Swiss-Prot record:
The lineage of its organism: Bacteria, Bacillati, Bacillota, Clostridia, Eubacteriales. Pfam families: FabA. Signal peptide: none annotated. Involved in unsaturated fatty acids biosynthesis. Catalyzes the dehydration of short chain beta-hydroxyacyl-ACPs and long chain saturated and unsaturated beta-hydroxyacyl-ACPs. The active site is at H47. The gene is fabZ. The keyword Lyase applies. One of its GO terms (molecular function) is (3R)-hydroxyacyl-[acyl-carrier-protein] dehydratase activity. It comes from the Bacteria. Its EC number is 4.2.1.59. GO terms for biological process: fatty acid biosynthetic process; lipid A biosynthetic process. This is 3-hydroxyacyl-[acyl-carrier-protein] dehydratase FabZ. It comes from Clostridium perfringens (strain 13 / Type A). The keyword Cytoplasm applies.
Length: 139
């Protein structure tokens, strides 16, 4: 388990682009993390003022940050910078709204050198909001 201060020590992202609030579980190949979505998120000012919905690309970014935590927790990658290298088969199935808690689960399915591949799923109340495959490069 990691709190926000421990997450900030691992990820280079800072406000307003840090999209992981807590890590519940972390192993060599899997991470389960959470993002508490509030009406105070800066992106809700423009997406959309009368019907606030978390942008899908930011859900994918939150998944990428969770996956990066799993990779950067490995001894050989500590202190390195994670880069989002690609996405595939991403689907959005449920809107994420203010007040939702986004559960972010990423399983690292392959690691070749400094390139990692993960299966990612974001859920709200047990229902899939977004799923897909993500690719990381560690610099």
């Amino acid at each position: 388990m990691m709190n926000i201060n421990e997450i900030k020590e691992i990820l280079p992202h800072k406000y307003p682009f840090l999209l992981v609030d807590k890590v519940e579980e972390i192993t060599e190949s899997k991470v389960v993390a959470y993002k508490n979505v509030t009406i105070n998120e800066p992106f809700f000012q423009g997406h959309f003022p009368d019907y606030p919905v978390m942008p899908g690309v930011l859900i994918v970014e939150a998944l990428a940050q969770a996956g990066a935590i799993a990779l950067l927790n490995k001894e050989e990658f500590k202190g390195k910078t994670p880069f989002f290298a690609g996405i595939d088969k991403v689907r959005f199935k449920k809107q994420v709204l203010p007040g939702d808690t986004l559960r972010l689960e990423v399983e690292i399915i392959k690691l070749r050198g400094s390139i990692g591949f993960g299966k990612a799923t974001a859920t709200v109340d047990g229902k899939i909001a977004c799923s897909g495959e993500i690719m990381f490069a560690i610099g």
